[in-house]
Amino acid sequence: MKYDYKQYESYWQNKWEEDKVFVCDIDKSKKKFYGLVEFPYPSGAGMHVGHIKAYGGLEVITRKKRMEGYNVLFPIGFDAFGLPTENYAIKTNTHPRTVTDNNIAKFTSQMKRVGFGFDWTRVIDTTEEDYYKWTQWIFLKLFEHGYVFRDKASVNYCPSCRCVLSNEDSQGGKCDICHSDVVQKSKDVWYLRITKYADKLLQGLKDVDYLPNIVLQQENWIGKSEGAFASFALKEVDEKLRIYTTRPDTMFGVTFMVMAPEHPLIDKYAEKIGNMSDVIAYREECAKKTEFERTQLNKDKTGVKLQGLTAINPLSGKEVPIFISDYVMMGYGTGAIMAVPAHDERDFEFAKKFGVDIIPVIKGGDGESAYTGDGEMINSEFLNGITNKKDAVSAAIKVLEEKGLGEGGTQFKMKDWAFNRQRYWGEPIPIVHCEHCGDVAVPYDELPLRLPNMEQFVPGEGGESPLAKVESFVNCVCPKCGAPAKRETDTMPQWAGSSWYFLRYLDPHNEKEFCSKEALDYWMPVDWYNGGMEHVTRHMIYSRFWHRFLYDIGEVNTPEPYAKRTAQGLILGPDGEKMSKSRGNVVDPNEIVDKYGADVLRVYIMFMGDYEKASPWSDSSVRGCKRFLDRVAGMAEMPGCASSAESESALHKLIKKVTSDIDNMKFNTAIAAMMSYINGVYDAGAINRDELKVFVTLLAPFAPHLAEEMWHDLGESTYVSLTPWPKYDESKTVDNTVEIAVQFLGKLKGTVVVPADADENTAWEIIEKSGVLDQALEGKTIVKKIYVKGRIFNVVAK
């Protein structure tokens, strides 16, 4: 059979769609399997090879599951709101709707051309009204239950994109979208109280099967810490400065306090501060810095000592000075810290620069740097002599609580989610601002709050949303009191639509609810979710938060959305570097399909290395996969033959290997095993037709077009994609014979082949006949024989 991919790949793709091979519906007589991949952001560049790898893993797994009799849901959609599309639309003077539709059409064509087995009847688009209606509905539920609030805050602002960014979207002081420097700006911000779910999000990680690194990243992102809150009285006024610390045991080593420059107590007691002009000047300097710049560990320490305000250490009773410094953030902890320079590197550097005392309270340091290890407590009154950190912390908390000056507590690194953007291409936030009633929710029966069509959607110079210019949208009536009111003009961030998309796939055409209870009960949770490591914090934590909230209010049936989460490694350029246009090392999957066919692309990407690790692209290996599929096709032209014990054993070993490797995402070794198998077939020069059919079913998840063609060429009228997955006979996977090492006095003299179940006498007879020990035993008497069944026969003689 000639491997002519151009002739049959599009044919089988059309047949699959015509006959709805991958379309599924609720069938309670079957076990369900919900496989999920991260739906793409449809960029103008189209799909890249990274998409093929990201989807290819679960593509193989879901095809196998379907053949194993599972009712498989494997959907796809498009996460199409967001800044990249809007920025491109502005640049090209094209409406975002047009850009989005064109890009989705391009992506759809490319995905179908690769032969992905998605259920195309369930496609969702986050920009469609029948989708974002329910995004708005969930937002209003969050608002209704007190998990949405508005506050004026210093926020991360991208001057290029002209919008507010969350901490997650501005890591490293750079905009996640355009990579411009982020600045700080005071704006009204909508927040989701994700911190209220911090403990539940941590606890939920114990009930799921995620890669260890994914669990670790989420735990670190949430950042739960155990410690204590303590109140330092201010000497000059009737006020207490509240701090949080994970090391209350070091409180006797506090020699100064540091407040964030924005701390409200500074303005409250401005008249008491003798150098307020210095404070104001320092604040102005801080306002020019991003949060990233302020919190860099290796930056030069700056600050101002407050003249006229002094703190009292609650345990020692000593007076300590108060500074303001930019490395303390108002949004972290309480906005103030106690400084223990002897045991904190940052505090040590600050103390050295400003000439503050350094008092060690843990034995072990040399005084030349901060000692951050464990040791015996010193200079700490009732804590002296304690060597166990946990005991010292507990003792300190106990005294603080007894004195009414503090209490044990927990803090989280994760902050509430900044949820609004001053841009056009996003879900309108369904809130009305009324002078009498405040912030009022748009009634549920008025959803969706539609995004108005705009020809000019460039953000305002001051960061004002383009929607603010649409009077017909802005001006409205308060749903509560009927007075004139104004609509919220900011839109939701791109993360909104992706925080629940896995639920809409279950019931994408339902106009009455986001998903029916029947569909939820049957399909949820997602059995296996695969995606990039770059999304295991932001997207996954956001979506877990939304899902857990919906569970708590009785709208979904499982506390966690994803039972299992895995991740693929990057595909690097041929030079071993990350692919980028600037490096000129980008590989276009369309060119590979044009030149070699979709099956070669699919097989190569699954074969190129450990699926979870990064692998460089290799054109020569692509050609090697083409030769492999040529040889597979060539087996159809081979003479037939009767099955033998050897051929059956080889096939059953292959079934076992491929089955296990797919389940464990060891796709490369599964393909390597198939390559080895056909080498044996070519060595034999013939293949049994029934055994060839079994091989074709094993190939089907990897190279489905060729598999379908061969299946029909072998006389079958059904789809191999729906053919039962082959089962192996364990007894036929065990070798009948084994090769064992023959040793004399512990030194290898050769090997012999013996029956796998051979006892010592049988093995010895074979060794004697082989002559492998004749020379070694000449003139000697055997003293002892040592036989390790199936491995070694050692002879001792003298």
Report each predicted region and the residues it spans:
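NTP-handling and nucleic-acid-processing catalytic cores
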Residues: 3, 8-13, 49, 135-358, ...
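Long, His/Glu/Asp-enriched segments that create or flank divalent metal/ion-associated functional microenvironments
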Residues: 441-478, 483-487, 493, 741-745
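N-terminal catalytic cores of NTP/NDP-binding nucleotidyl/phosphoryl-transfer enzymes
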Residues: 25-96, 100, 123-138, 245-246, ...
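Conserved oxyanion/phosphate-binding beta-strand-loop segments in alpha/beta enzyme cores
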Residues: 1-36, 66-75, 99-106, 282-323, ...
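Helix-rich, typically C-terminal accessory recognition domains appended to large enzymatic cores
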Residues: 79, 144-156, 160, 408-437, ...
